[in-house]
Amino acid sequence: MSARESFNPESYELDKSFRLTRFTELKGTGCKVPQDVLQKLLESLQENHFQEDEQFLGAVMPRLGIGMDTCVIPLRHGGLSLVQTTDYIYPIVDDPYMMGRIACANVLSDLYAMGVTECDNMLMLLGVSNKMTDRERDKVMPLIIQGFKDAAEEAGTSVTGGQTVLNPWIVLGGVATTVCQPNEFIMPDNAVPGDVLVLTKPLGTQVAVAVHQWLDIPEKWNKIKLVVTQEDVELAYQEAMMNMARLNRTAAGLMHTFNAHAATDITGFGILGHAQNLAKQQRNEVSFVIHNLPVLAKMAAVSKACGNMFGLMHGTCPETSGGLLICLPREQAARFCAEIKSPKYGEGHQAWIIGIVEKGNRTARIIDKPRIIEVAPQVATQNVNPTPGATS
């Protein structure tokens, strides 16, 4: 997917001050309930999970615990399993078309974390803000829907239904469903000591979109202008937007090629939170140790200048439609990282070895002084495409 021209509201007969992100108070997957609260809220669901059919299901495969975003349900006939996920987010960027693509990629990412590359069907869930004018609704929502549809088509699937409601905030999400044979998905519970951890997208999207909004807020911009330029912020924002809209499908396919043992996608709990969730699911007594943090260029410096208010260096900064965190055999990891950059997969994208799996007690941590890998933006070298439907 090529880089895009900046969204211009006036091209759609909207006021030049229109901002999609003003129709929510939370951004992206930053809407997630805190992990500790979530665990308590869902305890009763975990206790009753498959209780009525435990004998049948338990004999087929281990169940996934709370904190993992995909359900795997063995079907009663044919040796097949239903793999399904649902997710929704709030607007995080101001380009409606790209926001639709990001929302779709975010839903699909949970399937990709299971190594599933084919999605049989998608539903779209939309909350249309009752604070929008009729013109804003009629101009903006079709762009969001088109972006969602285009991303689904890129994934080889289609949107066949869903639900649309009025809501104070804009809500964007969906359901992704597929039926798989056992060899078409990878249960996220087989990490072994000696594996390495690979990440397929850089961190820092939440920082990039936040500071991009600060360009219009002098009191906030003044806090960071000594460590970052306006051009740096614009590039980081564009890079974040392209990364969030990029499907994790290629990485999902390569998980099979290079014998991945477990994976999860990085979203609202940050890299540490999702690493901890994944560690809890492991059959073996292992722990994950993260040594390296690949971060969008200049966003680590911005985070530090803000007193680390984003939690980026601590691994708690939310990501939206982030990369896959994959446990790979040590001898396969470098080959995985080389292969995912190959032009055969389109533009090719980086992946990074960021840590190790060692014997432990099913926990995850980031070392005290992780190495920050500054990830230079690729958007500056890509072709620019206009937004669909814009008038000149």
Swiss-Prot record:
Give the GO molecular function terms: ATP binding; metal ion binding; protein heterodimerization activity; protein homodimerization activity; selenide, water dikinase activity
Q: Where does Mg(2+) bind?
A: D69, D110, D265
Task: Give residue numbers for the site Important for catalytic activity.
Answer: K32
Q: Which domain of life is it from?
A: Eukaryota
How cofactor binds (record note)?
Binds 1 Mg(2+) ion per monomer.
- Top enzyme class of this protein? transferase
Q: How does it sit in the membrane?
A: Peripheral membrane protein
- Binding positions (ATP): K32, G67, M68, D69, D87, D110, G161, G162, Q163, T164
**Keyword Transmembrane helix (UniProt):** no
Q: Name one Pfam family in it.
A: AIRS_C
Concerning InterPro entries, the annotation shows: PurM-like_C_dom (IPR010918), PurM-like_C_sf (IPR036676), PurM-like_N (IPR016188), PurM-like_N_sf (IPR036921), SPS/SelD (IPR004536)
Question: Reaction catalysed?
Answer: hydrogenselenide + ATP + H2O = selenophosphate + AMP + phosphate + 2 H(+)
How is this protein annotated for GO cellular component?
cytoplasm; nuclear membrane; plasma membrane
Q: Which cofactor does it need?
A: Mg(2+)
* Gene Ontology BP term (one): selenocysteine biosynthetic process
Q: Where is the active site?
A: C31
Question: Does the keyword section mention Transferase?
Answer: yes
User: Keywords, A to Z?
Assistant: Acetylation, ATP-binding, Cell membrane, Kinase, Magnesium, Membrane, Metal-binding, Nucleotide-binding, Nucleus, Selenium, Transferase
* Subunit-structure text: Homodimer.
| Record-stated family | Belongs to the selenophosphate synthase 1 family. Class II subfamily.
Q: What does this protein do?
A: Synthesizes selenophosphate from selenide and ATP.
| Protein name per the record | Selenide, water dikinase 1
Organism, scientific name:
Bos taurus (Bovine)
